[in-house]
C-alpha cells in the first residue's frame, strides 16, 4: 500500500503575561491534512481533515529549575473540504509537562511527560504514537503503540564534559521512558498496551551542528 500526504497549517501566538521568571502565552492554529492511500493503482481511501487548535503555554522558575506546561485542545472541523463523518469531527485534549534542573554545575536532570485524551475513536494520524526516535527508545522499527488515550513519561540524566562556546558542548546521558495507551471501543487485547525502554548516549552541539549518538534498548512491553 502506498500513501500520499499533504498538509498546511497556520499558527498565531500571543504573550499574555511575563516577568523576569515566568511567561504565559496563548496559541491558536488551523491545519488541513489530505491523505490518499493506494493499492497498486487503485484508490483505497481519500481523506481530508481540518483541525482547529488552541493552546495555553506557561514557563516559570521552580526549585532552581525551569518548569513548563502546555494545555492543548484540538477539534475536527467541517471546513476547507474536510470529511463530514463523525470520526473527522473529533475532540482531543493534551497536556505536556517538562522540567529542567541542574543538580550540580555539570549534572542535569530532565523530565518530560505528554498525555492525551479523547472520547472519540481517532484516525491513526491523530492518535498519540509512542516508541522510537524522540519517544520511548528501543522501538524504532517495530513495536510502536498508539491510542486515543495515552501517556508517555521520560527521565534523563546528563553530564557536561565540555561546555565551551568555541569548541561546543559534549554531554553523555542516560534515559528511561515509559508509555501506555488505550483505544476506545476496542475491548480486545490489542485495545491497550504499554512499552518501556532505556538509552545511553553522547550528545554534542555547537552553533551550526548537533550530533546525538545513542544505544537504545527495549525493556518491557505488552
Identify the meaning behind each predicted range.
Residues 136-140, 196, 216-221:
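Short beta-alpha connecting loops at secondary-structure transitions
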Residues 9-11, 23-29, 55, 66-72, ...:
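Residue-level detector of the transmembrane beta-barrel scaffold of outer-membrane proteins
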Residues 36-169, 182-184:
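C-terminal outer-membrane beta-barrel translocator/porin domains of Gram-negative envelope proteins
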Residues 1, 9, 15, 29-35, ...:
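Outer-membrane beta-barrel pore domains and translocons
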Residues 160-162, 171-198:
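Outer-membrane beta-barrel transmembrane domain signature
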Residues 4-8, 46-52, 89-93, 147-153, ...:
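Residues that define the transmembrane beta-barrel architecture of outer-membrane proteins
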Residues 1-65, 222:
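Gram-negative/organellar outer-membrane beta-barrel architecture
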Amino acid at each position: 500500500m502506498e500513501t500520499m500526504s499533504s498538509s498546511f497549517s497556520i499558527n498565531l501566538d500571543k504573550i499574555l503575561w511575563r516577568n523576569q521568571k515566568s511567561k504565559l502565552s496563548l496559541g491558536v492554529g488551523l491545519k488541513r491534512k489530505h491523505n490518499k492511500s493506494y493499492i497498486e493503482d487503485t484508490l483505497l481511501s481519500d481523506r481530508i481533515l481540518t483541525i482547529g487548535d488552541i493552546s495555553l503555554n506557561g514557563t516559570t522558575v521552580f526549585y532552581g529549575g525551569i518548569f513548563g506546561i502546555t494545555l492543548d485542545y484540538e477539534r475536527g472541523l467541517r471546513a476547507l473540504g474536510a470529511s463530514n463523518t463523525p470520526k473527522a469531527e473529533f475532540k482531543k485534549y493534551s497536556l505536556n509537562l517538562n522540567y529542567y534542573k541542574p543538580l550540580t554545575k555539570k549534572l542535569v536532570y530532565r523530565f518530560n511527560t505528554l498525555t492525551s485524551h479523547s472520547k472519540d475513536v481517532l484516525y491513526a494520524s491523530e492518535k498519540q504514537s509512542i516508541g522510537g526516535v524522540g519517544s520511548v527508545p528501543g522501538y524504532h522499527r517495530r513495536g510502536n503503540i498508539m491510542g486515543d488515550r495515552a501517556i508517555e513519561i521520560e527521565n534523563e540524566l546528563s553530564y557536561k564534559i565540555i561546555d565551551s562556546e568555541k569548541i561546543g558542548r559534549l554531554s553523555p546521558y542516560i534515559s528511561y521512558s515509559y508509555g501506555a495507551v488505550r483505544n476506545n471501543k476496542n475491548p480486545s487485547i490489542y485495545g491497550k498496551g504499554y512499552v518501556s525502554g532505556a538509552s545511553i548516549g553522547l550528545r554534542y552541539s555547537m552553533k551550526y551542528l548537533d550530533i546525538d549518538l545513542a544505544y537504545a534498548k527495549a525493556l518491557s512491553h505488552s
